[in-house]
Design a protein with these regions (language model features):
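Alpha-helical transmembrane segments of multi-pass membrane transport and lipid-handling proteins
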Residues: 95-119
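Alpha-helical transmembrane segments of multi-pass membrane proteins
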Residues: 110, 114, 122, 126-148
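Small-residue-rich midsections of specific transmembrane alpha-helices
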Residues: 55-77, 141, 291
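Hydrophobic alpha-helical transmembrane segments
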Residues: 165-178, 188-220
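Interfacial/gating helices of multi-pass transporter permease domains
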Residues: 38-60, 192, 196-197, 241-245, ...
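N-terminal membrane topogenesis motif
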Residues: 1-32, 88, 92, 234-254
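Membrane-interface junctions at transmembrane-helix termini in multi-pass inner-membrane proteins
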Residues: 143-165
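Transmembrane-helix boundary and interhelical linker motifs in polytopic inner-membrane proteins
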Residues: 67-97, 155-160
């Protein structure tokens, strides 16, 4: 028992170290990439940053409601089943949730894509914001199912794949952003809207890389086959309903800050046009500074 406890503690420490490294690298990349990105955007930098921020505000809220706190619940359930020596229940659970979250991702991705013109109009920007939000819909499509796999590894107390997937996501995202922006602004058409659209589409490219890393670790550790081959039966429908009920308070509290940011976005340009003579372009630039 003592050896098992020591092993679990060591595994937890390693996992904490991996997550710390992942968070540090992600924040470092976030602080560094903006410098060349801003320079390459040239005179359009402030407006490009404003459009980027507006797209991401809505995108972040869609990510929040599309996952609905379920990955954390998955981690708790997997940890519970493993403690009870019922690992097959864990694999059956993941298979059920993967199907459910894939469907959820599809629904919310379609909503974001189809309602982008309406959301862009509410933001006061118009058609410039539409392709940016539509490019982010692709990331919404796969994020829910990817987050389930992350929750599975968290429940297995194996945080290395979780952290490695985060690192891969951020590294590939930043590489795509910078390469696309450089080629468009410095060697191509110079269309800053296309550069911003590719910069937001980079979220999807990064998630694909993250998904590949997670699948690799599942296969390497012999877990992928067990997820799809297990015949263990669980009451997944009831578990889904119970999980969503538990997640509702987290959705409400977690989305509060995001909703305030969206409210600012939806009212800033419209209210400023009522009381000032600034152009729409000037107001987008101001929004980028204030946000």
């Amino acid at each position: 028992m003592s050896n098992e406890n020591n092993h679990q503690q060591a595994q937890m420490l390693r996992g904490t170290a991996w997550l710390t490294a992942s968070n540090f690298i992600s924040r470092l990349l976030g602080a560094i990439y903006i410098i060349p990105w801003y320079i390459w955007m040239g005179t359009y930098a402030a407006k490009a940053n404003g459009l980027f921020t507006m797209g991401y505000n809505i995108y972040a809220w869609f990510l929040l409601i599309s996952t609905a706190g379920i990955p954390v619940a998955v981690a708790k359930q997997v940890a519970k089943y493993n403690t009870m020596r019922e690992e097959e229940h864990s694999f059956a659970l993941i298979r059920s949730f993967l199907g459910f979250m894939t469907g959820l991702g599809l629904v919310f991705a379609l909503v974001l894509y189809l309602f982008s013109p309406w959301l862009a109009d509410l933001s006061g920007v118009g058609k410039d914001l539409i392709p940016i939000m539509q490019s982010l819909a692709w990331a919404v499509l796969i994020f829910p199912s990817m987050s389930v796999i992350r929750g599975f590894f968290q429940g297995m107390n194996n945080l290395k794949p979780y952290a490695m997937s985060q690192i891969a996501e951020q590294v590939i995202r930043v590489i795509w952003m910078l390469l696309a922006t450089f080629f468009i602004m410095k060697m191509g058409s110079g269309d800053y809207l296309s550069a911003v659209t590719q910069s937001t589409f980079a979220a999807f490219v990064g998630m694909v890389a993250s998904f590949v890393v997670l699948i690799y670790f599942l296969a390497q550790e012999g877990l992928l086959k067990r997820v799809f081959e297990t015949r263990d039966k669980i009451n997944s429908k009831r578990l889904l309903v119970d999980t969503i009920k538990e997640a509702i308070p987290f959705i409400l509290t977690g989305s509060a800050i995001q909703l305030f940011q969206i409210l600012d976005q939806m009212t800033f340009i419209r209210s400023m046009t009522w009381f000032t003579n600034y152009s729409n372009e000037d107001l987008v630039v101001m929004f980028s500074y204030f946000s």
